[in-house]
Design a protein with these regions (language model features):
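Membrane-embedded catalytic cores of phosphoryl/pyrophosphoryl-handling enzymes
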Residues: 3-10, 65, 163-261
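Membrane-interface loops
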Residues: 25-29, 114-199, 253-256
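Hydrophobic cores of alpha-helical transmembrane segments in multi-pass inner/ER membrane proteins
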Residues: 47-62, 97-110, 184-189, 235-251
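N-terminal transmembrane-helix/juxtamembrane module of multi-pass inner/ER membrane proteins
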Residues: 2-100, 146-147, 151-166
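Alpha-helical transmembrane segments and their helix-start/interface "positive-inside/aromatic belt" motifs
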Residues: 1-9, 123-130
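Membrane-interface helix-boundary motifs at transmembrane edges
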Residues: 2, 60-70, 88-90, 113-124, ...
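Hydrophobic, lipid-facing residues on alpha-helical transmembrane segments of integral membrane proteins
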Residues: 49-53, 74, 78, 101-102, ...
């Protein structure tokens, strides 16, 4: 099933990259709707969820990895900063304090709720997810700096547009899409972990994973944050990193999951 999903996403990505090389600007012109509620929810909601997940992951592995306390604190601050950006009223400082309190309460609650044996059981999975996510973040960030592609919503005229297959050397961070790459790697990680347990529903599970990724790609184009090719590149980066890591997960976690033949 993983092989079929990889082939489908790779072929779809290649086709969409070719389409983006020809129609990137036209597609963005047609879909741009910055007031689209669903797209706004995905744009603002996913970074908030991701930072909360990071704080929880670091909090649950900190018992055996003291350096994770730094990550826990950093993720908590980033969550609070993101919350203050989304909810600036009545006061940004009040929002920051409330957000930090909520994250700390949730993290401490889970740390006390889970037994040492339960935390030891899930710790390898959390570490594997963090390794995948940060690999994707680093690759995406480096490419953003190297490409310098301007975002659609930052363009003042069509002359500023540049194709995805050439570095643009402009003051932009459009290529590739960070929202898409981080969501895709998260969903693909969940697919790897859930597939053995839900093997009879593997086709439905794969469809849900693809639907989530494609919805994020669509929302980023609608918001004018990225062109089609930017979102496809983000998806393919996540797919490549997931495929490389998944082979290691099979060896490490195969005996810890309810696998099906």
């Amino acid at each position: 099933m993983k092989r079929n999903l990889t082939i489908f996403m790779s072929c779809t990505g290649i086709i969409l990259l070719l389409a983006g090389a020809r129609w990137d600007l036209a597609i963005s012109d047609a879909l741009y709707a910055p007031d689209h509620l669903f797209a706004i929810l995905l744009q603002d909601g996913w970074p908030l969820i991701m930072k909360l997940m990071l704080a929880l992951c670091f909090a649950l592995i900190a018992d055996r990895r003291p350096a994770a306390y730094i990550g826990w604190g950093g993720a908590t601050l980033l969550f609070a900063q993101e919350a203050s950006r989304i909810f600036p009223r009545p006061s940004a400082s009040v929002t920051v304090l409330l957000a930090m309190a909520c994250v700390l309460f949730l993290c401490l609650f889970l740390r006390r709720r889970l037994s040492p044996a339960q935390k030891a059981r899930i710790r390898p999975f959390l570490i594997a997810y963090l390794q995948l996510l940060f690999t994707v973040l680093i690759i995406t960030g480096v490419l953003k700096l190297l490409w310098g592609r301007i975002r659609y919503r930052q363009m003042e005229d069509a002359a500023q547009f540049c194709v995805w297959y050439r570095p643009c050397a402009q003051a932009g961070t459009s290529f590739p899409s960070g929202h898409t790459s981080t969501l895709a790697c998260t969903l693909l990680f969940l697919f790897s972990m859930l597939l053995p347990r839900f093997y009879p529903q593997r086709h439905l599970l794969a469809c849900c994973i693809c639907a989530g990724i494609f919805l994020m790609m669509f929302s980023r184009i609608v918001m004018g944050a990225h062109f089609l090719s930017d979102t496809v590149a983000g998806m393919l980066i996540a797919l490549a990193c997931w495929k490389c890591c998944d082979r290691q997960w099979e060896r490490r976690f195969g005996s810890k999951r309810t696998a099906k033949p």
